[in-house]
Amino acid sequence: MLKIAICDDDAGDRERIAEDLRVYAAAHQEHSIEMTVYSSAFAMLDAFEKAGCPDIALLDICMPGMLGTELARDILRCSENTDILFLTTSSDYAVDAFALHAADYIQKPYTQEKLSASLDRVIALRQERTWLLLPCEGELHRIALEDVLYIETDGKRRSFSLASGRKLTARLTAAQLQDCLAGRRGMI
């Protein structure tokens, strides 16, 4: 199941993006796409607090109350595993978007082919990632191995420092940690 969220304050744009995503999902049923649509950044953030962040977020940038780049920053604070694609009429925020490691920056009006090509690329990259499941604070956290900067050890406590600045702590034995990282390039 691939969770994709759309956030755009313009009803016409929101419906167009949703329809284009439905067309994409119908042509790529192997991805089993679940779509949610939001009309404001605040509605999207409220939903994420309850249900967790999506795998991919399609965000407008110029929205009342909160820019899409600010929304992306908030999303990435709670989930560094969410890929962000910006769909916007403005070219003014491209540098900010890529500073957030946006997967793409698509200017409106766009074509179905452009959105599909971008989604194909992002989904292919997601499938190539190596994922770790870490038991932290009573929950399982799924993190991309490439996001782990370093691991600190204190007894059975392992603190994983992530590229986002977040730190996750898991209780793992040395053997469990070794199993978790076995065969992963760059890890000792």
For each predicted feature, which ranges?
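Conserved SAM-binding loop
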Residues: 6, 37, 86-87
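Conserved binding/recognition cores within well-folded domains
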Residues: 117-188
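Conserved acidic segment of CheY-like receiver
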Residues: 2-22, 57
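A generic structural motif
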Residues: 25-35, 81-82
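Short, well-ordered amphipathic alpha-helices
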Residues: 15-25, 44-45, 72
